[in-house]
């Protein structure tokens, strides 16, 4: 059951599996809802609810992306109400095995990303109470995260970070800063070390993004700009400052907040909260995007949240608020 309190968070494991996972994020005990997916027609079957051992926080209000992330064998989910995140093992039947809870190293964790054995958690912080931070972890032999500590990033008070993710090859870490109107990129090593913070400034209201599945240094970001809401593609080589490759949107691209791409990178979608719509972009080998069309439901009410694409690029899944 997809309810209003579901966080903006989908996860489809990086394997030829059939699981779909959603974080509930209520003001109380947090949980992950698990579904199995019919690979032929895409339909979902409910598996069960799995408590994270942490707490959600409705005050986040959807200002987050990638609150759940999965590898071939594990799933990780943030608990913004208890300042920690949970590790699960993935079972063959789509169910989850609780492994443990780890402190996020900050306040209000809203996003999480993993590359190899390295995890970074984005803590949104709380204005006047705690600063935002991006905290690194490595997976131990027991499969549980251990804090790196040395490479934690502390942000300015007004940053309001909403999303963190690695690029395709894990060589760049991308952080979207909604309050600072900026996108940060870091060079990342296989042991989790971060160097060379490069900032792309003047990017109005970035909320959610995704990596390019084919270009190692290209990422996409949805900009909830009051004047020109749109999707942008950026290039972050780590040598020069990150730059905007292209920018595109349609009249129905109102309040774009989340993004997803097919495995071949030829299709990119933005999920547009205010319009309740989806915008399709054509992805080019150069890293540029071009707006193609929009899916606008019969009801014009808001509520389009996170989106995810299956591993074959055949099915798109969208989380809807205000619907069950």
Across the structure, where does each feature detected by a protein language model lie?
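Short loop/turn segments immediately following beta-strands, especially the blade-tip
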Residues: 35-43, 88-95, 136-145, 185-193, ...
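Structural motif
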Residues: 29-33, 84-86, 129-135, 181-185, ...
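Beta-strand-rich domains and repeat architectures in extracellular enzymes and scaffolds
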Residues: 16-37, 50-73
């Amino acid at each position: 059951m997809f309810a209003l309190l579901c966080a903006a968070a989908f996860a489809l494991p990086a394997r030829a599996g059939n699981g779909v996972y959603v974080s509930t994020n209520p003001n109380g005990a947090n949980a992950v809802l698990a579904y199995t997916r019919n690979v032929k027609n895409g339909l979902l079957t409910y598996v069960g609810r799995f408590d994270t051992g942490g707490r959600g926080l409705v005050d986040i209000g959807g200002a987050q992306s990638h609150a759940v992330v999965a590898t071939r064998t594990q799933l990780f989910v943030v608990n913004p109400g208890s300042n920690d995140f949970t590790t699960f093992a993935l079972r063959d039947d789509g169910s989850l095995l609780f492994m443990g809870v780890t402190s996020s190293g900050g306040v209000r964790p809203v996003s999480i990303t993993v590359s190899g054995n390295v995890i970074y958690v984005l803590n949104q912080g709380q204005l006047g109470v705690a600063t935002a931070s991006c905290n690194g972890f490595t997976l131990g032999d027991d499969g549980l995260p251990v804090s790196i500590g040395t490479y934690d990033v502390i942000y300015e008070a007004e940053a309001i970070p909403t999303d963190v993710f690695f690029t395709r090859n894990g060589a760049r870490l991308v952080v979207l800063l909604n309050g600072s109107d900026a996108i940060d990129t870091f060079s990342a090593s296989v042991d989790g070390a971060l160097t060379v913070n490069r900032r792309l400034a003047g990017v109005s209201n970035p909320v959610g993004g995704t990596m390019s599945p084919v270009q190692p240094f290209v990422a996409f970001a949805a900009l909830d700009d009051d004047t020109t809401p749109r999707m942008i593609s950026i290039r972050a080589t780590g040598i020069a400052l990150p730059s905007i490759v292209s920018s595109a949107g349609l009249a129905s691209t109102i309040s774009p907040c989340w993004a997803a791409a097919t495995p071949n990178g030829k299709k990119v979608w933005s999920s547009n909260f205010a319009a309740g719509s989806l915008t399709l972009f054509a992805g080019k080998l150069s890293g540029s995007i071009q707006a193609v069309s929009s899916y606008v439901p019969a009801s014009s009410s808001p509520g389009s949240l996170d989106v995810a694409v299956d591993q074959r690029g055949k099915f798109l899944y969208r989380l809807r608020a205000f619907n069950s």
